[in-house]
A protein has these predicted regions:
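Ser/Thr/Asn(+Pro)-rich, low-complexity disordered segments
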Residues: 2-441
Length: 441
């Protein structure tokens, strides 16, 4: 047999031997790379850092101080000034007659909180809620399915983000709709006489259209075309899922984080970060807001309590490291670009401040009023007390609480919004009575 014939017969063995050699070389090379980076992890054991974390105790005090009540009165002033007399809906920003389902949910939270704090009596709370529900029932829906992303608070017209009427609409936001649905659940528990009105409202919305395979689905309009897309990232997604669960919707994938979670270490704390991109281009944002809403409105579950503890501790840790008071979340801005996410982790880096479009604007990092009050209500530490002290001086008794303080300049971020003033009220109600889902005695 010739050499060539022997070589042909042996070629399978040669290929196998070469593969084994290459595999050995690859293993040896990988071993030279060392351990994975200590600040990031992903995989099946990603919950382990949170299992090892002791959640901070909640700080429900059982009563309101005189100072608490003064803070609450200032926050309620915003809604006294910004609710349309005809429709009973609240402006999302001071003197700007536009709202979303998210901000309308904030107004509902503000009413329930003001009632618990004794700022308004039960008949006034009932009347305000009844009027708001009636106007929500009168809304022209996007494609006759679900509420549009924005409405004019006086005319109830579908509008764009410039508050200009738009015939087709912008689509619906699954997160925003879930928030108003969740607050309707709070209304049913706290004002059962309004349960029939709530049921009639929600039965008029095709809520099943925003749930598909256990996920939350929103829509966008682009060049006249309507596109459906999964909505929500870790934090906001689970908060919205809890809201939908109040009405029996199967949102198991939205509530589950296991397939989309990675851990980034910030100030030594494990921070829960979504592996999915924001708007398909930018690493996802981690802010305080969804955890504040979850704790103040629904009460933490074990997982969200641990996530919230880590996110809070990272902010406290940044102060210990830099001396800069830190309470970060999403905020309106008093100047362009008018909205930013001050993150614990965002855009692939710690403490990044991001626009919705994914541009970085760290000069607009804000010590957020709502984060200061929210964390103080939930955890009540010496550090959270310092946060409240820092923002207290900027309260406007005639207007409400502003968004906060710009870290870089110390100047006030003078935008005044429904969200911030609602969170202040919810925080102060929580201090005295616990989460809103718990029916007040």
């Amino acid at each position: 047999m010739s050499f060539r014939e022997n070589l042909a017969r042996a070629r399978g063995h040669i290929v196998m031997i070469l593969a084994l050699i290459l595999g050995l070389v690859l293993v040896l090379w990988l071993e030279t790379l060392g351990e994975p980076q200590p600040d990031a992890s992903a995989g099946p054991d990603m919950m382990q850092p949170f299992d090892d974390l002791d959640p901070l105790p909640l700080a429900i005090r059982g009563e309101s101080s005189d100072r608490d009540m003064e803070h609450a009165r200032i926050a309620w002033t915003y809604f006294q000034n910004n609710v349309d007399e005809g429709t009973g809906l609240a402006n999302s920003v001071h003197a700007y007659p536009s709202t979303t389902m998210w901000e309308t949910g904030s107004y509902v939270v503000a009413i329930l909180s003001a009632e618990r704090l004794g700022l308004i009596d039960r008949p006034e709370a009932h009347d305000r809620l009844d009027r708001a529900i009636a106007s929500l029932s009168d809304l022209r829906l996007f494609q006759d399915v679900l509420p549009n992303k924005a409405y004019h608070t006086r005319t109830l017209q579908l509008v764009d983000y410039g508050n200009q009427p738009v015939e087709l609409g912008l689509g619906w936001s699954a997160l925003d709709v879930a928030r108003i649905v969740g607050t309707m659940g709070l209304v049913q528990r706290n004002h059962p006489e309004l349960a029939p009105a709530v049921e009639a409202l929600l039965n008029g919305w095709q809520l099943d259209q925003m749930v598909d395979g256990g996920e939350l689905i929103g829509t966008n309009v682009s060049d006249g075309n309507i596109r459906r897309n999964q909505e929500g990232r870790v934090g906001y997604e689970q908060y919205a899922a809890k809201a939908m669960m109040l009405f029996g919707f199967d949102v198991f994938r939205a509530y589950d984080v296991s397939g989309d979670l990675m851990v980034q270490r910030v100030e030594g704390q494990p921070i829960p970060v979504d592996t999915r991109l924001h708007r398909a281009t930018t690493p996802a944002f981690v802010v305080s807001e969804p955890y504040l809403f979850d704790g103040l409105e629904f009460g933490f579950d074990d997982r969200s309590h641990r996530f919230a503890t880590a996110i809070y501790r990272a902010q406290e840790g940044r102060f210990a490291e830099t001396g800069k008071l830190t309470a970060v979340t999403e905020s309106h801005l008093h100047e362009a670009p008018y909205f930013a996410y001050s993150t614990v982790w965002g855009g692939g880096a710690p403490w990044a401040v991001m626009t919705f479009q994914g541009e970085r604007i760290d000069s607009r990092r804000t010590l957020a009023t709502k984060a200061a009050f929210g964390w103080d209500a939930l955890f009540g530490t010496d550090y959270t007390a310092r946060l409240v002290d820092a923002v207290e001086q900027f309260a406007d008794p005639a207007k409400g609480w502003p968004e906060g303080i710009y870290e870089e300049t110390g100047a006030v971020n003078g935008s005044t919004t429904a969200n911030t003033n609602a969170v202040v009220l919810a925080a102060l109600a929580f201090k005295a009575h616990g989460p809103l889902v718990r029916v007040a005695p």
